[in-house]
Protein backbone atom coordinates (compact mmCIF):
# COMPACT_ATOMS: atom_id res chain seq x y z
CA UNK A 1 0.00 0.00 0.00
CA UNK A 2 2.78 2.37 0.88
CA UNK A 3 4.55 1.49 -2.34
CA UNK A 4 1.40 2.24 -4.31
CA UNK A 5 1.02 5.62 -2.59
CA UNK A 6 4.63 6.45 -3.29
CA UNK A 7 4.19 5.65 -6.99
CA UNK A 8 1.01 7.74 -7.22
CA UNK A 9 2.69 10.63 -5.42
CA UNK A 10 5.68 10.44 -7.74
CA UNK A 11 3.48 10.44 -10.84
CA UNK A 12 1.52 13.41 -9.49
CA UNK A 13 4.75 15.31 -8.84
CA UNK A 14 5.98 14.65 -12.39
CA UNK A 15 2.71 15.90 -13.85
CA UNK A 16 2.94 19.09 -11.79
CA UNK A 17 6.51 19.70 -12.92
CA UNK A 18 5.65 19.12 -16.58
CA UNK A 19 2.62 21.38 -16.36
CA UNK A 20 4.64 24.02 -14.59
CA UNK A 21 7.34 23.86 -17.25
CA UNK A 22 4.83 24.18 -20.07
CA UNK A 23 3.22 27.15 -18.39
CA UNK A 24 6.60 28.79 -17.99
CA UNK A 25 7.38 28.10 -21.65
CA UNK A 26 4.03 29.56 -22.67
CA UNK A 27 4.67 32.66 -20.59
CA UNK A 28 8.13 33.07 -22.10
CA UNK A 29 6.74 32.43 -25.59
CA UNK A 30 4.01 35.02 -25.04
CA UNK A 31 6.58 37.56 -23.84
CA UNK A 32 8.79 36.77 -26.81
CA UNK A 33 5.85 36.96 -29.15
CA UNK A 34 4.87 40.34 -27.77
CA UNK A 35 8.44 41.50 -28.15
CA UNK A 36 8.46 40.40 -31.78
CA UNK A 37 5.13 42.16 -32.43
CA UNK A 38 6.48 45.49 -31.23
CA UNK A 39 6.41 47.81 -34.24
CA UNK A 40 8.39 50.76 -35.50
CA UNK A 41 8.09 53.74 -33.21
CA UNK A 42 6.98 57.03 -34.71
CA UNK A 43 9.80 59.20 -33.44
CA UNK A 44 12.47 61.57 -34.70
CA UNK A 45 15.00 58.78 -35.13
CA UNK A 46 12.83 56.76 -37.51
CA UNK A 47 11.10 59.75 -39.18
CA UNK A 48 13.37 62.85 -38.99
CA UNK A 49 10.88 65.15 -40.72
CA UNK A 50 8.37 66.64 -38.29
CA UNK A 51 5.70 66.81 -40.94
CA UNK A 52 6.27 63.19 -42.01
CA UNK A 53 5.90 62.08 -38.39
CA UNK A 54 2.61 63.94 -38.16
CA UNK A 55 1.42 62.41 -41.43
CA UNK A 56 2.39 58.87 -40.44
CA UNK A 57 0.83 59.23 -37.00
CA UNK A 58 -2.49 60.58 -38.24
CA UNK A 59 -2.87 58.51 -41.40
CA UNK A 60 -1.26 55.13 -40.76
CA UNK A 61 -1.21 54.51 -36.99
CA UNK A 62 -4.69 52.98 -36.81
CA UNK A 63 -4.67 52.16 -33.08
CA UNK A 64 -2.90 55.39 -32.02
CA UNK A 65 -0.16 53.64 -30.03
CA UNK A 66 2.60 55.78 -31.59
CA UNK A 67 4.14 52.82 -33.40
CA UNK A 68 3.52 50.97 -36.63
CA UNK A 69 2.92 47.23 -36.75
CA UNK A 70 3.77 45.25 -39.86
CA UNK A 71 0.07 45.04 -40.73
CA UNK A 72 -0.26 48.82 -40.52
CA UNK A 73 2.82 49.25 -42.71
CA UNK A 74 1.61 46.73 -45.29
CA UNK A 75 -1.77 48.47 -45.54
CA UNK A 76 -0.23 51.69 -46.92
CA UNK A 77 -0.53 51.88 -50.73
CA UNK A 78 -0.33 55.66 -51.23
CA UNK A 79 1.90 58.39 -49.81
CA UNK A 80 0.25 61.77 -50.08
CA UNK A 81 2.03 64.86 -48.79
CA UNK A 82 -0.27 67.61 -49.99
CA UNK A 83 -0.25 71.44 -49.79
CA UNK A 84 -3.67 71.40 -48.11
CA UNK A 85 -2.29 69.16 -45.40
CA UNK A 86 0.70 71.48 -45.08
CA UNK A 87 -1.53 74.51 -44.44
CA UNK A 88 -3.54 72.60 -41.83
CA UNK A 89 -0.42 71.42 -40.06
CA UNK A 90 1.17 74.87 -40.23
CA UNK A 91 -1.66 76.47 -38.28
CA UNK A 92 -0.79 74.36 -35.24
CA UNK A 93 2.86 75.39 -35.06
CA UNK A 94 4.24 78.03 -32.74
CA UNK A 95 7.92 77.88 -33.66
CA UNK A 96 9.46 80.30 -36.13
CA UNK A 97 11.53 77.88 -38.21
CA UNK A 98 8.70 76.09 -40.01
CA UNK A 99 11.07 73.26 -40.90
CA UNK A 100 8.14 71.12 -41.93
CA UNK A 101 8.29 72.80 -45.35
CA UNK A 102 11.50 70.87 -46.01
CA UNK A 103 10.39 67.26 -46.39
CA UNK A 104 12.94 64.63 -45.37
CA UNK A 105 12.00 61.33 -47.01
CA UNK A 106 13.87 59.15 -44.52
CA UNK A 107 11.53 56.62 -42.93
CA UNK A 108 9.10 56.46 -45.84
CA UNK A 109 11.08 53.59 -47.37
CA UNK A 110 9.42 51.10 -44.98
CA UNK A 111 6.11 51.28 -46.86
CA UNK A 112 6.93 48.61 -49.43
CA UNK A 113 3.38 48.30 -50.82
CA UNK A 114 3.10 51.92 -51.92
CA UNK A 115 1.99 52.31 -55.55
CA UNK A 116 1.31 56.07 -55.65
CA UNK A 117 3.48 58.90 -54.34
CA UNK A 118 2.36 62.52 -54.27
CA UNK A 119 4.70 65.03 -52.65
CA UNK A 120 4.10 68.79 -52.75
CA UNK A 121 6.61 71.17 -51.20
CA UNK A 122 5.59 74.43 -52.82
CA UNK A 123 6.18 77.90 -51.36
CA UNK A 124 3.71 78.49 -48.56
CA UNK A 125 2.77 81.60 -46.58
CA UNK A 126 2.03 81.87 -42.86
CA UNK A 127 0.97 85.06 -41.06
CA UNK A 128 1.85 87.09 -44.18
CA UNK A 129 5.37 85.65 -44.09
CA UNK A 130 6.55 83.68 -47.11
CA UNK A 131 8.46 80.57 -46.18
CA UNK A 132 11.50 80.41 -48.44
CA UNK A 133 12.94 77.14 -47.19
CA UNK A 134 11.17 74.33 -48.94
CA UNK A 135 12.21 71.25 -50.84
CA UNK A 136 12.94 67.53 -50.65
CA UNK A 137 15.77 65.81 -48.82
CA UNK A 138 16.94 62.20 -49.19
CA UNK A 139 14.58 61.46 -52.08
CA UNK A 140 16.75 58.44 -52.92
CA UNK A 141 15.16 56.60 -49.98
CA UNK A 142 11.99 56.27 -52.03
CA UNK A 143 13.79 54.18 -54.66
CA UNK A 144 13.41 51.27 -52.25
CA UNK A 145 9.67 51.26 -52.98
CA UNK A 146 9.71 49.03 -56.04
CA UNK A 147 5.91 48.83 -56.47
CA UNK A 148 5.46 52.53 -57.25
CA UNK A 149 3.45 53.10 -60.45
CA UNK A 150 2.58 56.79 -60.17
CA UNK A 151 4.83 59.65 -59.03
CA UNK A 152 3.87 63.31 -58.56
CA UNK A 153 6.39 65.86 -57.29
CA UNK A 154 5.71 69.59 -57.00
CA UNK A 155 7.73 72.54 -55.74
CA UNK A 156 11.28 71.22 -55.43
CA UNK A 157 13.60 74.18 -54.79
CA UNK A 158 16.90 72.39 -54.27
CA UNK A 159 19.04 71.08 -57.10
CA UNK A 160 16.92 68.12 -58.14
CA UNK A 161 18.21 64.76 -59.28
CA UNK A 162 15.70 62.05 -60.08
CA UNK A 163 16.77 58.58 -61.19
CA UNK A 164 13.30 57.39 -62.07
CA UNK A 165 14.72 54.29 -63.74
CA UNK A 166 15.21 52.98 -60.20
CA UNK A 167 11.43 52.61 -59.90
CA UNK A 168 11.06 49.38 -61.94
CA UNK A 169 7.25 49.59 -62.26
CA UNK A 170 6.80 53.34 -62.69
CA UNK A 171 4.16 54.18 -65.35
CA UNK A 172 3.11 57.80 -64.77
CA UNK A 173 5.31 60.80 -63.91
CA UNK A 174 4.32 64.40 -63.25
CA UNK A 175 6.79 67.10 -62.19
CA UNK A 176 5.56 70.60 -61.30
CA UNK A 177 7.33 73.87 -60.47
CA UNK A 178 10.87 72.52 -60.31
CA UNK A 179 13.27 75.40 -60.90
CA UNK A 180 16.58 73.59 -60.93
CA UNK A 181 16.31 70.09 -62.40
CA UNK A 182 19.89 68.89 -62.56
CA UNK A 183 19.47 65.30 -63.73
CA UNK A 184 16.56 63.15 -64.87
CA UNK A 185 16.62 59.49 -65.88
CA UNK A 186 13.55 57.59 -67.05
CA UNK A 187 12.63 53.94 -66.74
CA UNK A 188 11.52 51.80 -69.67
CA UNK A 189 8.00 51.15 -68.32
CA UNK A 190 6.88 54.80 -68.14
CA UNK A 191 3.76 55.44 -70.24
CA UNK A 192 2.94 59.06 -69.41
CA UNK A 193 5.16 62.06 -68.66
CA UNK A 194 3.92 65.53 -67.75
CA UNK A 195 6.00 68.63 -66.95
CA UNK A 196 4.51 71.88 -65.61
CA UNK A 197 6.97 74.78 -65.29
CA UNK A 198 10.07 72.63 -65.01
CA UNK A 199 13.46 74.13 -65.88
CA UNK A 200 16.70 72.32 -66.67
CA UNK A 201 19.90 72.93 -68.62
CA UNK A 202 19.99 69.29 -69.70
CA UNK A 203 18.78 67.58 -72.87
CA UNK A 204 15.72 65.44 -72.18
CA UNK A 205 16.20 62.05 -73.84
CA UNK A 206 12.95 60.13 -74.35
CA UNK A 207 14.30 57.83 -77.05
CA UNK A 208 14.81 54.90 -74.67
CA UNK A 209 11.49 55.24 -72.85
CA UNK A 210 10.04 52.52 -75.06
CA UNK A 211 6.65 52.31 -73.33
CA UNK A 212 5.96 56.05 -73.54
CA UNK A 213 2.52 56.86 -75.01
CA UNK A 214 1.92 60.48 -73.97
CA UNK A 215 4.18 63.47 -73.37
CA UNK A 216 2.81 66.79 -72.16
CA UNK A 217 4.68 69.93 -71.13
CA UNK A 218 3.55 73.41 -70.10
CA UNK A 219 6.02 76.20 -69.35
CA UNK A 220 8.88 73.74 -69.83
CA UNK A 221 12.45 74.64 -70.75
CA UNK A 222 15.47 72.47 -71.50
CA UNK A 223 18.27 72.29 -74.07
CA UNK A 224 16.32 70.09 -76.43
CA UNK A 225 14.19 66.95 -76.49
CA UNK A 226 15.19 63.70 -78.19
CA UNK A 227 12.22 61.54 -79.20
CA UNK A 228 14.08 58.98 -81.31
CA UNK A 229 12.06 56.15 -82.86
CA UNK A 230 9.66 55.61 -80.01
CA UNK A 231 7.00 53.33 -81.54
CA UNK A 232 4.34 53.67 -78.83
CA UNK A 233 4.38 57.46 -78.53
CA UNK A 234 1.03 58.69 -79.86
CA UNK A 235 0.37 62.11 -78.36
CA UNK A 236 2.64 65.11 -77.76
CA UNK A 237 1.33 68.38 -76.33
CA UNK A 238 3.56 71.37 -75.54
CA UNK A 239 2.57 74.89 -74.49
CA UNK A 240 4.70 77.92 -73.62
CA UNK A 241 7.98 76.08 -74.09
CA UNK A 242 11.14 78.02 -73.25
CA UNK A 243 13.92 79.50 -75.34
CA UNK A 244 16.13 76.41 -75.01
CA UNK A 245 13.83 74.41 -77.30
CA UNK A 246 14.42 75.76 -80.80
CA UNK A 247 13.36 72.66 -82.73
CA UNK A 248 10.91 69.80 -82.37
CA UNK A 249 11.86 66.71 -84.37
CA UNK A 250 9.23 63.98 -84.42
CA UNK A 251 10.04 62.79 -87.93
CA UNK A 252 11.03 59.29 -86.77
CA UNK A 253 7.88 58.63 -84.74
CA UNK A 254 5.92 56.23 -86.95
CA UNK A 255 2.74 56.01 -84.87
CA UNK A 256 2.32 59.60 -83.70
CA UNK A 257 -1.33 60.59 -83.86
CA UNK A 258 -1.25 64.17 -82.65
CA UNK A 259 1.28 66.96 -82.18
CA UNK A 260 0.05 70.07 -80.41
CA UNK A 261 2.27 73.13 -79.86
CA UNK A 262 0.84 76.41 -78.52
CA UNK A 263 2.21 79.79 -77.44
CA UNK A 264 5.86 78.96 -78.13
CA UNK A 265 7.50 82.04 -79.61
CA UNK A 266 11.08 80.72 -79.37
CA UNK A 267 10.39 77.65 -81.49
CA UNK A 268 12.04 77.95 -84.94
CA UNK A 269 11.50 74.62 -86.68
CA UNK A 270 9.32 71.52 -86.64
CA UNK A 271 10.20 68.25 -88.40
CA UNK A 272 7.30 65.85 -88.81
CA UNK A 273 6.82 62.49 -90.50
CA UNK A 274 4.15 59.82 -90.02
CA UNK A 275 1.56 61.89 -88.20
CA UNK A 276 -2.24 62.20 -88.40
CA UNK A 277 -2.99 65.55 -86.74
CA UNK A 278 -0.93 68.67 -86.19
CA UNK A 279 -2.04 71.73 -84.25
CA UNK A 280 0.17 74.88 -84.07
CA UNK A 281 -1.02 78.09 -82.47
CA UNK A 282 0.85 81.31 -81.72
CA UNK A 283 4.29 79.97 -82.73
CA UNK A 284 5.51 83.04 -84.56
CA UNK A 285 9.12 81.92 -84.85
CA UNK A 286 8.22 79.17 -87.34
CA UNK A 287 8.60 80.39 -90.93
CA UNK A 288 8.04 77.25 -92.98
CA UNK A 289 6.02 74.04 -92.65
CA UNK A 290 7.04 70.98 -94.64
CA UNK A 291 4.35 68.30 -94.67
CA UNK A 292 5.17 66.96 -98.13
CA UNK A 293 6.09 63.49 -96.86
CA UNK A 294 3.31 63.14 -94.30
CA UNK A 295 1.15 60.62 -96.16
CA UNK A 296 -0.94 59.82 -93.05
CA UNK A 297 -1.84 63.42 -92.27
CA UNK A 298 -5.59 64.02 -91.93
CA UNK A 299 -5.97 67.33 -90.14
CA UNK A 300 -3.76 70.45 -90.08
CA UNK A 301 -4.53 73.47 -87.91
CA UNK A 302 -1.87 76.20 -88.05
CA UNK A 303 -2.98 79.58 -86.71
CA UNK A 304 -1.02 82.80 -86.06
CA UNK A 305 2.51 81.72 -86.88
CA UNK A 306 5.27 83.23 -89.01
CA UNK A 307 4.75 80.64 -91.77
CA UNK A 308 4.85 82.01 -95.31
CA UNK A 309 5.39 78.73 -97.13
CA UNK A 310 3.70 75.33 -96.86
CA UNK A 311 5.08 72.32 -98.70
CA UNK A 312 2.38 69.71 -99.18
CA UNK A 313 2.44 68.43 -102.78
CA UNK A 314 2.69 64.76 -101.74
CA UNK A 315 0.09 64.76 -98.98
CA UNK A 316 -3.18 63.82 -100.67
CA UNK A 317 -4.87 62.50 -97.53
CA UNK A 318 -5.54 65.82 -95.73
CA UNK A 319 -9.24 66.38 -95.08
CA UNK A 320 -9.12 69.57 -93.05
CA UNK A 321 -6.55 72.32 -93.71
CA UNK A 322 -6.68 75.46 -91.57
CA UNK A 323 -3.86 77.97 -92.17
CA UNK A 324 -5.45 81.11 -90.76
CA UNK A 325 -3.63 84.35 -89.89
CA UNK A 326 -0.19 83.42 -91.16
CA UNK A 327 1.91 85.05 -93.90
CA UNK A 328 1.08 82.76 -96.81
CA UNK A 329 1.01 84.35 -100.28
CA UNK A 330 0.86 81.20 -102.41
CA UNK A 331 -0.15 77.59 -101.85
CA UNK A 332 -0.05 74.50 -104.07
CA UNK A 333 -3.13 72.30 -103.60
CA UNK A 334 -2.31 69.82 -106.38
CA UNK A 335 -3.67 66.32 -105.66
CA UNK A 336 -4.88 67.42 -102.25
CA UNK A 337 -8.00 65.57 -101.08
CA UNK A 338 -9.18 68.48 -98.97
CA UNK A 339 -12.80 68.96 -97.91
CA UNK A 340 -12.36 72.07 -95.77
CA UNK A 341 -9.83 74.87 -96.42
CA UNK A 342 -9.29 78.02 -94.35
CA UNK A 343 -6.85 80.75 -95.40
CA UNK A 344 -8.28 83.65 -93.42
CA UNK A 345 -5.96 86.50 -92.57
CA UNK A 346 -3.22 85.66 -95.12
CA UNK A 347 -1.83 88.07 -97.76
CA UNK A 348 -2.82 85.64 -100.53
CA UNK A 349 -4.08 86.84 -103.93
CA UNK A 350 -4.92 83.66 -105.84
CA UNK A 351 -6.15 80.29 -104.62
CA UNK A 352 -6.07 77.57 -107.25
CA UNK A 353 -8.35 74.72 -106.22
CA UNK A 354 -8.90 73.39 -109.75
CA UNK A 355 -7.05 70.17 -108.94
CA UNK A 356 -8.46 69.81 -105.46
CA UNK A 357 -11.73 68.20 -106.55
CA UNK A 358 -13.12 67.39 -103.11
CA UNK A 359 -13.11 70.88 -101.61
CA UNK A 360 -16.61 71.85 -100.49
CA UNK A 361 -15.77 74.56 -97.94
CA UNK A 362 -13.38 77.50 -98.39
CA UNK A 363 -12.95 80.16 -95.70
CA UNK A 364 -11.18 83.29 -96.92
CA UNK A 365 -11.33 86.75 -95.37
CA UNK A 366 -9.12 89.70 -95.99
CA UNK A 367 -5.72 89.90 -94.32
CA UNK A 368 -5.50 91.47 -90.88
CA UNK A 369 -2.84 93.87 -92.17
CA UNK A 370 -4.90 95.32 -95.04
CA UNK A 371 -5.15 99.09 -94.65
CA UNK A 372 -8.50 100.74 -94.25
CA UNK A 373 -10.04 101.53 -97.62
CA UNK A 374 -7.82 99.05 -99.49
CA UNK A 375 -10.01 96.48 -101.21
CA UNK A 376 -8.25 93.14 -101.22
CA UNK A 377 -9.48 91.01 -104.09
CA UNK A 378 -8.96 87.26 -103.62
CA UNK A 379 -9.48 85.15 -106.70
CA UNK A 380 -10.51 81.52 -106.29
CA UNK A 381 -9.75 79.43 -109.38
CA UNK A 382 -11.98 76.35 -109.55
CA UNK A 383 -11.44 75.17 -113.17
Give the predicted meaning of each segment.
Residues 79, 117-119, 151-153, 173, ...:
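Conserved hydrophobic beta-strand positions in leucine-rich repeat
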Residues 82, 120-122, 154, 176, ...:
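Per-repeat beta-strand-to-loop junction in leucine-rich repeat
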Residues 342-383:
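Leucine-rich solenoid repeat scaffolds
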Amino acid sequence: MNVKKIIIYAMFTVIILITSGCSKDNIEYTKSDKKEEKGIEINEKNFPSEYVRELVSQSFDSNNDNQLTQNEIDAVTELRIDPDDTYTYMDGLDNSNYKYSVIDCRGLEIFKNVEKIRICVEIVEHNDEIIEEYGLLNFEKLYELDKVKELFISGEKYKAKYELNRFPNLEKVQLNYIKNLDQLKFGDEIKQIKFNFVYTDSVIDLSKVHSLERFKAIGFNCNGIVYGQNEKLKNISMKEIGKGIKEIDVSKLKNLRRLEVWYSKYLKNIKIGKIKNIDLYECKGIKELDISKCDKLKRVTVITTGIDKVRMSKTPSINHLCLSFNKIENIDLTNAKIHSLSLQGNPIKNIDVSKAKRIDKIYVKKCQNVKKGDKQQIKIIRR
